[in-house]
A protein has these predicted regions:
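Residue-level recognition of beta-strand->loop/alpha-helix junctions
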Residues: 9, 39-40, 70
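Histidine-acidic metal/acid-base catalytic patches
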Residues: 1-32, 45, 88-95, 140-161, ...
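Flexible, active-site-proximal loop/turn residues at the rims of small-molecule/cofactor binding pockets
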Residues: 42, 105, 134, 193, ...
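Conserved beta-strand positions in the central sheet of alpha/beta enzyme cores
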Residues: 36-37, 68, 100, 129, ...
Length: 243
């Protein structure tokens, strides 16, 4: 099974001045990669469009699916984020398969606002997912309630399960996974020790069992800072767990 790479893997390189395009180019030739997820906050506004166009072409050339992490919340006091339309247009332009937002806080919405959101999501070919956050909006009970509400409102939203974010709100990923498993459409993988991200196998997460419990159609993204020399080993560990 192929593995996805979130560009959080290249945090050190990006902080040192590398572009996400530069980093992703290093994956060319790695047949075990099936998807790439770029991060909105890693782009420079002045070069974003040019870089994203090049990344999109690179993904097509290598038969990788392209995902995009939006550094914003989908839900808030005014209903849903007004950036959704703009980001869906961006996704269409650059052939982005999926947009990921943080959940935010679901508030009461008028029927017309709900209908507008539903139509916006249904009219797009791009999948939109919400993710559990490392704050009060990411508490298991809150996420469970939000996902049930999304289901009741017939909103075609997916759910990105982040296995690391639970630790930063003093919860555990394993019971959360058991509760939310049926809603998971994308999986963000990281291992945590003492609320710090570590290499796979060095933390407290039973990540192998979580991966084995996922349907084999669920995209799995490695999403933590990794020294470049350690990336092949980390990818191999994920593949081994999935084999």
């Amino acid at each position: 099974m192929q593995v996805g790479i979130n560009t959080a893997v290249y945090e050190d390189e990006v902080k040192a001045g590398a572009s996400q395009l530069d980093c992703i180019k290093t994956l060319v030739g790695r047949n075990e990669i099936g998807a790439v997820e770029v991060r909105g906050e890693f782009f420079k506004p002045t070069t974003k469009d040019t870089e994203l166009a090049a990344i999109s072409q690179l993904c097509r050339d290598n038969h990788w699916d392209l995902y995009y992490s939006v550094p914003e919340e989908l839900f808030g006091p005014n209903g849903y984020n007004a950036s959704l339309q703009t980001n869906l247009d961006m996704a269409t332009k650059y052939q982005i398969k999926s947009l990921k937002y943080s959940l935010g806080k679901v508030s009461l919405m008028s029927s017309s606002t709900l209908s507008q959101l539903r139509q916006l999501l249904m009219s797009s070919q791009t999948q939109v997912t919400i993710e559990n956050q490392p704050n009060d909006n990411g508490q298991l009970g809150v996420v469970e309630t939000a996902l049930e509400w999304i289901k009741q409102q017939l909103l075609p939203l997916g759910y990105t399960f982040d296995s690391g974010n639970w630790y930063w709100i003093d919860q555990q990923p394993e019971p959360a996974f058991a509760t939310l498993k049926s809603a998971i459409t994308v999986f963000h993988l990281k291992d945590i020790k003492n609320q710090n991200t570590v290499m796979l196998g060095d933390g407290d997460t039973d990540w192998q069992q979580l991966l084995k419990a996922l349907p084999n159609t669920t995209p799995i993204f490695i999403e933590y800072n990794i020294q470049s020399q350690n990336l092949p080993e980390q990818i191999a560990l994920v593949q081994q767990a999935l084999s």
